[in-house]
A protein has these predicted regions:
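Beta-lactam-recognizing serine transpeptidase/beta-lactamase-like catalytic domain environment
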Residues: 1-14, 19-182
Length: 182
């Protein structure tokens, strides 16, 4: 029988938002009490008027004024789009894989070490890995250039990111226990 807990990799979606929040805190982009106004539609800074310059919450509904705590409670995609956009904008200072490094610290890119057969590693692709995948497998990975949109998607747990249910459980256990990843 298939053990989906360790053999299957899924996009974590909004359950990834605490990882993005920590990256934003560490980068100095946000403080817990900083408030932003979430009107439901996020416009990528300096992007223009293209359709790819806009990201929206579910149903394009805004959550109003949000800080770190309420952004998690209300699951404001807008708040995390802003963090992702600014992590990418600050890539010269932070590196172009700052969010992925934070995901790695939570154990998302390695197996957990549990003694179960067929455990898979999750992934949080970096710009360099996406370029390499494009070079090696151009039909499967036709886009080799990382953009702001890749980081924005990853900031809400979508896109170039996959985790096993056990990895996600371990990450949340580390949050709950003060930071120890087992």
């Amino acid at each position: 029988a298939r053990n989906r807990c360790v053999e299957d990799v899924y996009e974590p979606g909004s359950t990834f938002k605490p990882v993005t929040a920590l990256a934003g805190l560490r980068a100095g982009l946000i403080r817990p009490a900083d408030t932003f106004y979430d009107d439901g539609i996020y416009e990528v800074s300096g992007c223009g008027d293209s359709e790819s310059c806009f990201f929206q919450n579910a149903d394009a509904e805004g959550t109003g004024s949000v800080n770190l705590q309420s952004s998690l409670t209300l699951s404001s995609d807008w708040y995390y789009y802003w963090i992702g956009d600014n992590l990418w904008a600050e890539r010269e200072r932070l590196g172009d894989d700052f969010l992925q490094q934070t995901a790695t610290e939570f154990g998302f890119t390695a197996d957990t070490g549990i003694d179960l057969a067929s455990e898979r590693e999750g992934f949080a692709f970096t710009p360099a890995q996406v370029r390499q995948l494009n070079e090696d497998y151009p039909e499967d990975f036709p886009y080799g250039d990382w953009t702001t949109g890749n980081t924005i998607n990853m900031s809400i747990g979508q896109g170039d990111l996959g985790v096993t249910p056990l990895q996600l459980t371990n990450a949340y256990a580390a949050i709950a226990n003060g930071g120890t990843l087992f």
